[in-house]
Structure formats: C-alpha cells, structure tokens
A protein has these predicted regions:
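Structural and coupling elements of P-loop NTPases
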Residues: 1-691
Length: 691
C-alpha cells in the first residue's frame, strides 16, 4: 500500500441530516475514485458503507463507516455517518478525528435539524466546513431558496462555488464559478463531463460572483488583501493558496451542487477537497495531558507514536476491531503501545484500511492517517495509545443519553448472555449506556432516541440470541417524614422450645434533604444489653430499604433507640432486628410520612417558533420554567420537571418541533410529591406487590 505524507491526506466526515444523500455521495466518490465498479443504491441495499443488516432493512445509516480512495495523488479518508439524531454519537465521534466536515443539504428539504447540529459541532471543534446541496435532479428543488436558507442559518459568507443550470428532473449542468465555465455531465452515471463557455445570460452573474470570491480570498490574508487593493485581482497561484487559507479561516464557506445518485458534480467536489481541503498539516499540534495532568503538545512531526481509538466494532469472524487516528509518529504491526487510560500495553496485530466491509491490509501507518486494528485486549473507544512519553488525548465529546427504558430477557437463564451483549454494544457505541439499578430492581438502558433503543434490542437478538422487551423504567421515588414520631414495639414469639422476645422504644425526626439515615441510641440503665443496638440498627436499615408507604427507599430520618426491654433467655439478635424494624415502621407512620420524587433539570433547544408549544407542554408535565437563553436562531428553555413525566420526552420534543428540537436532562434534586399523585403511586406500588 502506498504511503502518504500528512500534507497529501484528506480526512473528512460526511455529515448532515438523515436522507440528505451522505451515503450516496460517498458511493459516488468511491466510484469515480476507482474503488468500486458500479454505483450501489440505498433501495437495493448495495452501497459500500451501509452494509449492516439493520441499515439495509431500514434504508438508513446506523453506523459510521470509514472509506478510502485516491484522488489527484491525495489519499481521502472519508467517514460516512448517520444523519438521524438517534445515532448522533457516531457522527460526533467521527468529527472529533477528522480535519474537515463535508455537510450535505437536501435540495428539496433544505437545512434541517441535524444539518445545524453537525454545523455547530464542527464549529465547536474548530474544523473547516463545506456544504454540498445534493439531489438537484429531484422534483420541486429550489436551489436559490436553499442557498438563501443556508446563508440565513450559517452566515452570509456561504458562497456558491457552483450554480445549477437545469435543476430538477434531467439536471446535468453546473456553472463553475471559480473557473467561470459551464460543465455538462453525461447522463449515464459515469461522471464524465465536458467544459464549455458560459451562456451569455449567466456571464454577468458569474462575473460578479467571481469578483466576490476574489474578495473573500483576499480578506483571508493581509498580503493578498494589500495586493488586491493595489491591482484589483489575484493570480491563479495566489487564488489557489488563498482559497486554502480562506477555508482554514472560514472566511467563506464553499457550497457545491450535485446529484450523487446520478454522479453529477461529484468530481468537482473531490477536486476542491484535493486542492484546497484541510490536511493534518493544517493542525499540526493537538493538546494532550501528561502523567501529571498538565497540558502538553502532541506534534504531527513528533517521532513518538500517539494515536486515539475513535470507534470499536465487533465482527463475528475477527472479534473486536478498533478504528484509530495517528496523531504523531508511526504505527507498525507487531509493535507494543501503551494504553495510558488503562495503564496496559497492547501489541498491534493486523492493521487494515477499510471500504465498508472490504479491507486492505497495511503494515505501517504514518501520522495523520486513519486505519483499523484487530483484537486489542482491553482497549476501548476514546483510549490513547502511545510509545515513549505517556500522554492522554481528550476523550471524544459525545452526547449524554436522553431516553431510558427497562429491559428483561424473555427467557430465564439469559441473564449472563444479556450482560455480555450489553457490554459489547456499549463498547461499540458509548452513547448507549446500561446499568443495573438496585433501587428499582431493573436493568435500565439509555440512548439517544426510541429508534436507537429499538435497533439495540434488534442487535441483541441477532448477534447474541436474546429476546428482550422494553418497558417504562420505575421511578426511584423516596419516602421520608415531615414531622416527629415515636413508637414502642414488643416482639414476642413462643412456639415450643426457645422463644423470641424484644421490646424497642424509638423516636424519629426529619433531617435535611440529602443527609440520609442517622441511627443513634440514648439507652441508660440495664433494660437492654448494648449488644442489641446493632440488631435494632439492622432492623431499621431493613425497614428503610424495603420502604413503608410505597415500597420505596426511606431517606433523611434521624432515629433514636432510647429504651426497651429484654428477656434473659429469649432475647436474641433476630428478635431485636424484628422489633427494630416494626418500631421504626410504626414511628414512621406517625411522623407525617410523604413521598419524594426526583426532579430533573432539562434544557430544550428549539427554534423560536416552537417555544410556546414546548413551554405549554412543560407546564402540563408539572414543570417549572427556570429561564431562557438565545442561541443563534434557537432558544434554550431551562426547566425543572419531575422524572415521572419525562418518559419518551425526546420523542415528544421531536414531535412538537417537527424534528428540529433537542433536549438534555440531568438529575437535580428530590422534592415532596403532591398528595393526589402520592396516593396514586402508593396504590400502584401496592398493586404491583400484591401481584
């Protein structure tokens, strides 16, 4: 395999909203790059990147897929990413390791929610962006409207490098603004084209656009700007260097016109990426932490190896497969590298560059490149491996889950298989999280949306043979008291032979929220042997764990065991545990008991037009609006809402906003529940126990 220096590598992610043509654009690139012989299609499940069963059956991308090709003596490392927010972690993880974002826009639908999400994340990461309007051969396309929308959302410096001449069915002609020429494409999906002079009616507009482009390029560099003011133009070489510089500074955002399924306009996109796109050379250093936690620079030109795992896959015939990017030094088969996150050494076996499920073996990789390695023992997504000095790169910036469900295997005895399956799927997709909640006695899975969780359950069945059902998670309500109470409880049991006897006198009072259970004793005299204090405490802890009102954990109570009675023969540990448990129960019921419910902090980011609907829905969920902030064309609504009201809230937000809203949630505090709802919860829990 040919070795490429960093300046000849182009690492980019193809991102955008679902169904905006990302996979088809990648497929067309592979076709003109000679990596495939024919264009696959979404409909017949034959594209290179969507090769997993779930992707083919649903006709959407679910996984990020690395691809590669050569174009104009440059190596393209492309990552085709999912566009639906349920699988956003795949796209965000990919953006973290590339040098450029190619953002697709649907030629009919225009800028959509995940278009904006990807734009914002690429901006946050500081990587250059370019836009590709795809599907211009469809009915009802309105290029000028899409261009206007892109400028409104992303800035007036969005600049059309091309203009479609005959958009809609039969589309096969573009104006190349940079070269001021007409390009006509063959309609056989070959991508072949002919160049000719501009039509007379378009010359004036293209002239104006070309001059505007020169101004953008000049603004990116002081020396070019000075020459532009002096001479009024730039040479072709100055334009070439200036465009690259302008792309890095995002002085302007290039926008291209294509129909990927017809292979129209794709070659010029590749030309532009090859000539002007970002290379690893454009960001030679990345910040890492040394062993003391101090910031250090990792240089592209460094001799010591530093790489990061950005995705883990599990393949049936090879086991785990780790995708990585090299940030410094070289990586070679058979060499050992130190995992600084887990403090272990890993020997690198076979390495491959990939086009979907097709692999080409490589023995060595240089800084700036991307590849995969098989069968690392204990290395996971986001981990850093290095030689020489031990450094750790920042973890990938991935979103927190916003939807949760409880699961249970349909067949008894599948618990061990389920644990293995959940662990494997989490390693492959860190935005999928699972935990065993001992408080509500359920296994809870969390993800980015209903489809995310549904696809995960399908993968558990297909790969591990486990059938599971999704159900609403139980809410971890808590029980406490609002006042003081006391009780005297005698436990006496006689059934022939040794009996049981214990009497416990107890008083309780409320503590501040979050202070937990405090058990004390104030015994005086010899009524109760002090050895039984621990027994009473065990009984109290059992009562607190089992719950009293609704079978929920008891919190924030001070307990004082102040007196009691014992029998010289029949008093024993189990007797005082039982008496302690029942004394606490009676005292609790006399102390104004109540239920507490978890309150969540939520942030909902929506276009201004949808604020009223979202705020009304929050109020209907017993929520409190805590504030609002502007974020560009969006509003961020901050609120506190009971957890019990938030099941499927991610779906509600998408429904209310036409898919343009997103939300995040995190635990805030516990709060007293309204009496009418408390009564319903207690009755429901009692019903569940009776069943």
């Amino acid at each position: 395999m040919k070795q490429f220096v960093a300046s000849d590598i182009r690492n980019f992610a193809i991102v955008g909203h679902g169904a905006s043509g990302k996979t088809c654009l990648a497929e067309a690139m592979l076709k003109i790059g000679g990596e495939i012989n024919r264009l696959g299609t979404i409909e017949d499940g034959s594209t290179t990147s969507d090769y997993h069963p779930g992707e083919r059956s649903r006709q959407i991308s679910i996984h990020s897929t690395p691809l590669h090709m050569e174009w104009m003596d440059k190596k393209f490392n492309m990552i085709d990413t999912p566009g639906y927010s349920d699988f956003i972690g795949e796209a965000l993880g990919s953006l973290s390791v590339v040098d450029m974002a190619v953002i697709t826009i649907h030629a009919v639908n225009g800028v959509e929610v995940c278009t904006e999400t990807m734009w914002n994340h690429a901006s946050k990461l500081g990587i250059p962006k370019m836009l590709v309007v795809n599907g211009l051969d469809r009915e009802h396309t309105k290029f000028e409207k899409v261009l206007e929308q892109a400028r409104k959302r992303f800035g007036n410096n969005v600049f059309p490098m091309q203009l479609p001449v005959n958009e809609g069915p039969g589309y096969n002609k573009n104006i190349d603004v940079l070269r001021s020429e007409l390009i006509s494409y063959k309609e056989d999906r070959s991508g072949q084209m002919t160049e000719s002079e501009l039509p007379e009616e378009l010359k004036e507009r293209v002239k104006d656009l070309h001059e505007e482009l020169i101004e953008y390029v000049a603004e990116s560099d002081d020396s070019l700007l000075e020459k532009f003011f002096e001479e009024g133009s730039l040479t072709e070489e100055e334009m070439r260097e200036g465009i690259h510089h302008a792309i890095q500074n995002q002085t302007f955002i290039p926008l291209f016109c294509v129909s990927a399924t017809s292979n129209i306009g794709v070659a010029r996109v590749c030309d532009f990426i090859s000539k002007y796109g970002s290379s690893p050379d454009d960001r030679k250093t990345i910040i890492a932490n040394d062993e003391k936690g101090s910031d250090v620079d990792v240089s592209l030109d460094g001799s010591e190896t530093v790489l990061q795992i950005f995705k883990t896959m599990s393949e049936s015939h090879v086991g785990e497969f780790s995708l990585f990017r090299v940030y410094s030094g070289k990586v070679s088969t058979g060499k050992d590298y130190h995992n600084t996150n887990r403090n272990i050494n890993e020997r690198f076996g076979q390495m491959f560059i990939l086009n979907g499920k097709n692999r080409t073996q490589v023995d060595q990789l240089s800084a700036g490149d991307i590849a995969g390695v098989v069968k690392l023992k204990d290395t996971h997504t986001s981990n850093t491996l290095c030689s020489g000095k031990h450094v750790t790169l920042p973890a990938l910036d991935l979103p927190s889950p916003n939807i949760h469900a409880a699961i249970e295997p349909s067949a008894k005895g599948d618990e061990e298989k389920l644990a293995v399956g959940l662990s494997t799927l989490h390693e492959e997709d860190p935005t999928f999280i699972y935990r065993v909640d001992s408080e509500v006695k359920q296994t809870i899975i969390s993800g980015q949306g209903e489809l995310h969780l549904t696809v995960t359950t399908e993968r558990l069945k297909r790969r591990f043979g486990i059938d599971i059902a999704l159900e609403e998670p139980k809410v971890p309500f808590r029980e406490t008291i609002m006042g003081s109470g006391s009780a005297k409880y005698r436990h006496k049991k006689q059934s022939g032979g040794a009996g049981q006897f214990a009497e416990v006198w107890m008083r309780i009072e409320p503590k501040q929220r979050g202070e937990g259970i405090e058990f004390t004793h104030s015994l005086v005299g010899q009524n109760v042997d002090r050895v039984f204090v621990v027994s009473v405490e065990k009984g109290v802890k059992t009562a607190c764990s089992d719950g009293i009102l609704a079978g929920c954990k008891v919190v924030d109570v001070k307990v004082d065991f102040y007196d009691g009675k014992m029998h010289p023969v029949d008093s024993k540990d189990i007797a005082f545990q039982t008496a302690g448990k029942h004394a606490f129960r009676e005292a609790f019921l006399s102390a104004q008991p109540c239920l507490l419910e978890p309150i969540m902090d939520i942030e909902v980011k929506v276009p201004e037009d949808f604020m009223g609907d979202i705020m009304g829905d929050i109020s209907g969920k017993r929520g409190k609006i805590m504030g609002m902030d502007a974020d560009g064309s969006f509003q961020v609504i901050k609120a506190q809402v009971p957890q019990a009201e938030l099941y499927h809230y991610a779906t509600t937000v998408r429904s209310l906003t036409g898919g343009r809203g997103i939300h995040s949630e995190s635990f805030s505090h516990y709060e007293k529940m309204p009496k009418d709802i408390e009564k319903k919860v207690a009755q429901e829990r009692q019903k569940q126990e009776d069943e």
